[in-house]
């Protein structure tokens, strides 16, 4: 379907609806994904929606599938190609904490995930559509972190504990940016904070060897 503007008709695609839904979630939560408000946002009738999606659930599933692929699987695939275990973790931190948690970021495909997008999903963790995807993505992230720490030389329990600690830091930064933004670092201070996270949570090889063996590094 098309929408009419000052320059005539512009074709709308399923991608347009997905992007509008992502914006709506960032601004108002999962409940904001509703056909009529999204149609108004895009400047079209509700009938346009049904050319691309069967119902609201199918749109929400498309949004969640896109988010899971771009914000979890694509990041894992990109960092997994780094052969050095410590550098792999550093690259992962750079990806996860790349942007200040105040303005959101644009994915590789051009979808803009607003500052609160993942927190809005967390708010809807009991939703029958959102919950399973959220738990799967979060579990995948923690499991991958554990793999990275084990590759760095940590024993399974310690690798698991560090993975949980790192993911808690990631989630916590997002929540603090939403709840007490005045206490969060910005610009150069945020870069320094990210570097502090890296130096604190990713040990050098000497300390890794000691932690992994329970004794002195050779």
Predicted regions and their residues:
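Hydrophobic alpha-helical connector segments
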Residues: 62, 76-115, 163-166
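Short, basic, alpha-helical segments at the C-terminal edge of helix-turn-helix-like DNA-binding modules
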Residues: 65-72
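Amphipathic alpha-helical segments used for helix-helix packing
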Residues: 102-135, 179
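Solvent-exposed, amphipathic alpha-helical segments
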Residues: 16, 20-28, 74-81, 120, ...
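Amphipathic alpha-helical segments within well-ordered protein domains
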Residues: 76, 121-122, 146-150
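Helix-turn-helix
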Residues: 13-16, 20-63
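Short, solvent-exposed amphipathic helices
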Residues: 129, 133-140, 144-147
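Hydrophobic/aromatic-rich alpha-helical bundle segments in the mid-to-C-terminal region
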Residues: 107, 131-135, 150-218
């Amino acid at each position: 379907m098309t929408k009419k503007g000052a320059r005539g008709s512009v074709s709308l695609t399923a991608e347009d609806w997905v992007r509008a839904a992502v914006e709506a979630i960032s601004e108002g939560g999962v409940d904001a994904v509703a056909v009529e408000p999204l149609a108004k946002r895009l400047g079209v009738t509700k009938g346009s929606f049904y050319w691309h999606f069967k119902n609201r659930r199918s749109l929400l599933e498309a949004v969640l599938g896109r988010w899971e692929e771009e914000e979890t699987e694509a990041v894992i695939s990109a960092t997994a190609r780094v052969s050095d275990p410590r550098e792999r973790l550093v690259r992962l931190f750079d990806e996860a904490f790349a942007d200040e948690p105040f303005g959101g970021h644009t994915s590789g495909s051009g979808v803009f995930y607003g500052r609160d997008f993942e927190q809005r999903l967390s708010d809807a963790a009991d939703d029958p559509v959102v919950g399973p995807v959220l738990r799967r993505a979060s579990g995948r992230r923690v499991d991958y972190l554990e793999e990275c720490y084990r590759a760095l030389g940590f024993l399974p329990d310690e690798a698991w504990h560090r993975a949980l600690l790192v993911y808690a830091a990631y989630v916590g930064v997002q929540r603090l940016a939403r709840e007490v933004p005045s206490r969060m670092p910005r610009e150069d201070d945020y870069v320094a904070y990210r570097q502090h996270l890296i130096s604190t949570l990713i040990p050098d090889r000497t300390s890794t060897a000691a932690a992994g063996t329970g004794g002195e590094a050779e």
